[in-house]
Amino acid sequence: MKLNKIKVIVAGFRGKMGATAVQMILNAQNFELMALLGKKEEVSEAFGVPVFSRKEDLIGFDADIWLDLTAPEAAYKNTRFALENGFRPVVGTTGFTDDEVADLIKFSREKELGGLIAPNFALGAVLLMQFSKQAVKYFPDVEIIELHHDGKKDAPSGTAVKTAELMSEERLAHHQGAVDEKEALAGARGADLEGMRIHSVRLPGLVAHQEVIFGSKGEGLTLRHDSYDRSSFMTGIALGIRKVMTVSELKYGLEHFLDL
């Protein structure tokens, strides 16, 4: 019996994440690579499929999935373009505003197309976010340290922001630290989301790492996740590709497709 493969376009295939995703798709039995989208491409074909420099050239193209691993400044327009043209977006690019996410969810419902924007595709990172949401009920004083490679363009990371947003659902907003604390250097205490501080580290040699540090009287709790290389994201990407074919609206966060 012939297997009906899910047809995938990869946008951002020249990046490290995109290149890893292309190999995963090529090696997967139930996926079929259909086209690649890059920036100022000088080739017309790679891996046996056509290569495009303009997303508009993909209008009417035969594909199910638009896998977007591009840049924050392009992600919103790319995701909306995908929905407009009948592709189900699976997006690993971060940097979306709350209004942009809300708009895309609304638009996906109008188009009756499934999709996914995932701040992090690593299953361990998704579990870290969920564990943090549970822990903050008992440890409301918390700070986040996220560490990434020095090529990452946005700060704080989408994972850190999503973690803080999830914890804010269970935590009353309040200031942490001395009431009269003063920063000797501007920004020393990090970004502030409802009183939770988020600190961003950018260094060569890192991939993607996050610590959520809780403090209480006489004790502390630290939750940490590490992605040592980009293969850690491929299980989540593959899961997302499969799952968006079964739903009719865009979801924000891989946790919507996990049994948590």
From Swiss-Prot:
GO terms for cellular component: cytosol. (S)-2,3,4,5-tetrahydrodipicolinate binds at H149, G158, T159. Its EC number is 1.17.1.8. It is an enzyme of class 1 (oxidoreductase). It holds the Pfam family DapB_N. The active site is at H148, K152. NADP(+) binds at K40. Its main location: cytoplasm. SUPFAM superfamilies: Glyceraldehyde-3-phosphate dehydrogenase-like, C-terminal domain, NAD(P)-binding Rossmann-fold domains. It comes from the Bacteria. Keywords: Amino-acid biosynthesis, Cytoplasm, Diaminopimelate biosynthesis, Lysine biosynthesis, NAD, NADP, Oxidoreductase. PANTHER family: 4-HYDROXY-TETRAHYDRODIPICOLINATE REDUCTASE 1, CHLOROPLASTIC-RELATED (PTHR20836:SF0), DIHYDRODIPICOLINATE REDUCTASE (PTHR20836). This is 4-hydroxy-tetrahydrodipicolinate reductase. It comes from Lactococcus lactis subsp. lactis (strain IL1403). The lineage of its organism: Bacteria, Bacillati, Bacillota, Bacilli, Lactobacillales. The gene is dapB.
